[in-house]
Curated annotation (Swiss-Prot):
It catalyses: (S)-dihydroorotate + H2O = N-carbamoyl-L-aspartate + H(+). Its cofactor is Zn(2+). One of its GO terms (molecular function) is dihydroorotase activity. The modification N6-carboxylysine is found at K99. It comes from Shewanella sp. (strain W3-18-1). This is Dihydroorotase. Binds 2 Zn(2+) ions per subunit.
């Protein structure tokens, strides 16, 4: 197969950053994505409706002329988030979800939730108004090995939330383990997951064997090949529970290539192209459209996009860097080829 036409896809998890960087991140993701769930972990984070809506306006101001790209906003949950704030956010019409960052789990998560029981009244309000609950599913206990933090979170925390709030729609984001695949598969239809392109294409050997490659360092961290294969199986299974979320997370080159580098991989420059490679690797290009264009909007109760994009099997070389505000970002596959491109 050398050409594929699919319904315009959406990205159900992205970091666009803010300030001078917005112009570059929005340019990249709006090339062919119809919508994107925009993460709220700014500095300071988008912890209330007013802040999230102001961020929406800043993003929209950077959408290139002629693009119909629409950002979907997310509230950043803290120990102090109130049920009333959830109702305000829902009423805004622009904020479609609220996000759990366990305090300290990832970039700019220090304001996050210290104990999930602190937000139980908020989860009840979300269940009542129909707001989605997005979860960074890792524990932050320093005694837990970094490769086990997703599994332990599912066993100790997420399983209880799912049981206590059966009507709450939950997205376990950027899953990285067979444990997560199995949990989501066996859970009710109210539980779904996003999967990144880099977790489908790479495992921890790519990051650590033969030298440390910091641009593969992200959270949750890349796992064993057996987990990578489980993710590929889930994405290509045709299950409606799994959909596209790039978790594209830009950091300046010098912040990644450092003694203590930041977590995050940049894929917005070639998101659907990288997913096409992943699906082709398991002979499942016929399943790409549902994963990229149908399952996400269906789970969010939003209309599917009505137009299409066409992918062509034509190799191209990725630049060594892309502009990122007043600095540069090194993208995934920098200086190497990608097999597919959007026509």
């Amino acid at each position: 197969m050398t050409t594929i036409t699919i319904t315009r896809p959406d990205d159900w998890h992205i970091h666009l950053r803010d300030g001078a960087q917005l112009k570059d991140t929005v340019r990249d993701i709006s090339r062919y994505m119809g919508r994107a769930i925009v993460m709220p972990n700014l500095v300071p984070p988008a912890i209330d409706t007013e802040t999230a809506l102001a961020y929406y306006d800043r993003i929209k101001a950077q959408v290139p002329a002629g693009s119909q790209f629409e950002p979907l906003m997310v509230l950043y949950l803290t120990d102090k988030t109130s049920p009333d704030e959830i109702r305000r956010a829902k009423a805004s019409g622009k904020i479609v979800a609220a996000k759990l960052y366990p305090a300290g789990a990832t970039t700019n998560s220090d304001s996050g939730v210290t104990d999930v029981k602190n937000i139980y009244p908020v989860l009840q309000a979300m269940q009542e108004v129909g707001m989605l609950f997005l979860v960074h599913g890792e524990v932050t206990d320093s005694a837990i090995d970094i490769f086990d933090r997703e599994r332990v979170f599912i066993e100790n925390t997420l399983s209880k939330i799912v049981a206590d709030f059966p009507a709450l729609k939950i997205v376990l984001e950027h899953i990285t383990t067979k444990n997560a695949v199995d949990f989501v598969t066996q859970a009710s239809d109210n539980v779904a997951a996003t999967i990144t392109a880099h977790h489908l294409l790479y495992n921890r050997n790519h990051m650590l064997a033969g030298g440390i490659r910091p641009h593969f360092y992200c959270l949750p961290i890349l796992k064993r090949n057996t987990h990578q294969q489980a993710l590929l199986g889930a994405a290509a299974s045709g299950s409606k529970k799994f959909f596209l979320g790039t978790d594209s997370a830009p950091h300046a080159k010098d912040k990644k290539e450092a003694a203590c580098g930041c977590a995050g991989s940049y894929t917005a420059h070639a998101a659907i192209e990288l997913y096409a490679e992943a699906f082709e690797s398991v002979n499942a290009l016929d399943k790409l459209e549902a994963f990229a264009s149908f399952n996400g909007p269906d789970f969010y109760n939003l209309p599917r996009n009505s137009d299409t994009i066409t992918l062509v099997k034509k190799s191209w070389d990725v630049p060594a860097t892309y502009p990122l505000g007043d600095t540069n970002v090194v993208p995934i596959r920098a200086g190497e080829a990608i097999d597919w491109q959007v026509e």
